[in-house]
Amino acid sequence: MAAHGQGFDGVERRGLMFVLSSPSGAGKTTLSRLLIERVEGLSLSVSATTRPMRPGEVDGRDYRFVDKATFAVMVKCDELLEWATVFDNRYGTPRAPVEAALSSGRDVLFDIDWQGTQQLREKARADVVSVFILPPSATDLERRLHTRAQDSDEVIRGRMDRAAHELSHWAEYDYIVINQDIDEAFAEVQSILKAERLKRERRTGLTAFVRELQRQLEN
């Protein structure tokens, strides 16, 4: 797990996998977009999927589109960090581009559920930093889902039921952010990322840096 990428202070460090999870409507997608737009050195993980490409989507940008046989080979050869089946389509995170990013000191953002997060921890626990986003109340969550005007009442009821199940996994996460205000929630998430980037064990160039500093002080 050696790293060769320079941090912003010139010290080499290994990148990290920054995971955001939340019930639908709690703000995960908005926070992910803000992080990608405003934080340097962070890229969004691009999943492989067997579902058909939709109008406006670009292969390699939105998803890596593959057929079912190719996906099966990727699973068999352990080429995916995590994968799941959703409505008869398979989705997964290719290992190689993530490893390349981490080794070069770049961080990768994951917008995934608790199951995907669990798989990431099993494959690379030391590289994973997980954040669970909570709404301030069930009433507020339901209001947000209605405000989006994307789903029928039946679909919203289903999302609320799933939210109760997803919430049962909150204690598996490293950090919890209650999204009462999107700007405040973003500031908290950004602070978490900044602190995790500075952790000693990720800054692989610190030993050499300190030795050089000691040498200078002794001369």
From Swiss-Prot:
Top-level taxonomic group: Bacteria
One Pfam family named in its UniProt record: Guanylate_kin
Single GO MF descriptor: guanylate kinase activity
Span of domain Guanylate kinase-like: 15-194
Localisation: Cytoplasm
Catalytic activity: GMP + ATP = GDP + ADP
EC number: 2.7.4.8
Family under the similarity heading: Belongs to the guanylate kinase family.
Protein name per Swiss-Prot or TrEMBL: Guanylate kinase
Protein source organism: Nitrobacter hamburgensis (strain DSM 10229 / NCIMB 13809 / X14)
